[in-house]
Swiss-Prot record:
This is Ribosomal RNA small subunit methyltransferase H. GO terms for biological process: rRNA base methylation. Disulfide bonds: none annotated. GO terms for cellular component: cytoplasm. It comes from the Bacteria. HAMAP family: 16SrRNA_methyltr_H. It catalyses: cytidine(1402) in 16S rRNA + S-adenosyl-L-methionine = N(4)-methylcytidine(1402) in 16S rRNA + S-adenosyl-L-homocysteine + H(+). NCBIfam families: 16S rRNA (cytosine(1402)-N(4))-methyltransferase RsmH.
């Protein structure tokens, strides 16, 4: 296997502590990547079905985890389709589910994938090899929609001037690559407003990646599908890396653990409903200083988990 797809799974000990894998239990890893988290579950004696859109990641992780034999199965799919994948495999429910919403280092490092602004690459940014590329998206949407994406997904305060500059560059320059796109973005932001410690194009590139891959839509679908995917007693964990994702996970997990469905203006509960989920984490779990020193990527990781009661 190529060493490129080996990676240290973030919050490894915390994931094992929260998911509590036992021999023979079945887990769904919605974001296989380098296979780090799947490997941890398999080492604990669990069986794993793992999903990923990236065929190269699938091939590399499958080779790495081949020693576990039939206990491991990899499927090329978006994690938003987890329930459909399980149904196609004849599986009713799993004992645990996990997603790690970070982008793998190989995807960021390979210029041809179009995620990085440190080296010139095509305007792609797809996690897999199908669907609309970044260039397709930028040419399809207008300046106003682009500004909305930058503002909502990247929390870019200069969304309008950045969007205007990107659209102008697309019209004036051909072809436009990722390195040049980063220069265009940086040039649209006043130098005195450049963020500390990160490239001024970081927020824009994050927003565009989220839009190209519909990452928030995929996360919403995975969260909505949890009641139908988990068996009673099953646990779900999500590792997010920016505030938009963490907010979605936090709000959905809170909704799942609420029992009463009465209107909020009703002074006393009349429905008698019981919660079907319980929170395992009261607040987001963060990486230790030691882990961050070993793996700086873990600095922004946030882990939340719930358990299905019935």
């Amino acid at each position: 296997m190529s060493a490129d797809f080996r990676h240290e799974p973030v919050l490894a000990n915390e994931v094992l502590e929260l998911l509590r894998p036992r021999p023979g239990e079945l887990f769904l890893d919605g974001t296989l990547g380098g296979g780090g988290h799947s490997g941890l579950l398999l080492e604990a004696g669990a069986r794993v079905i793992a999903l990923d859109k990236d065929p190269r990641a699938l091939a590399a992780a499958t080779a790495r985890l081949a020693r576990f034999g039939e206990a491991f199965r990899a499927v090329r799919s978006d994690f938003r389709d987890a329930k459909n994948v399980l149904e196609a495999l004849g599986i009713g429910a799993v004992d645990g589910a996990l997603v790690d919403l970070g982008v793998s280092s190989p995807q960021l490092d390979e210029a041809e994938r179009g995620f990085s602004f440190s080296r010139p690459g095509p305007l792609d940014m797809r996690m897999g090899d199908t669907g609309e590329t970044l260039e397709d998206l930028l040419r399809r949407i207008d300046e106003r929609e682009l500004a909305r994406i930058l503002r909502e997904y990247g929390e870019e305060p200069f969304a309008r001037p950045v969007a205007r500059a990107i659209k102008a560059a697309l019209e004036a320059e051909a072809p436009l690559d990722t390195a040049r796109l980063a220069e265009v973005v940086a040039g649209a932001i006043p130098r005195k407003a450049w963020p500390h410690r990160i490239h001024p194009a970081t927020r824009t590139f994050q927003a565009l990646r989220i839009a190209v891959n519909d990452e928030l839509g995929a996360l919403a679908a995975w969260l909505d599908g949890l009641p139908g995917v988990l068996a009673p007693g099953g646990r779900a964990a999500a590792i997010s890396f920016h505030s938009l994702e963490d907010r979605m996970v936090k709000e959905k997990f809170r909704a799942l653990t609420q029992a009463c469905t009465c209107p909020p203006d009703l002074p006393v509960c009349a429905c008698g409903a019981k919660a079907s989920f319980a929170a395992i984490t009261r607040k987001a779990v963060k990486a230790s200083d030691d882990e961050i020193a070993r793996n700086p990527r873990a600095r922004s990781a946030r882990l939340r988990a719930v358990e299905k009661l019935r």
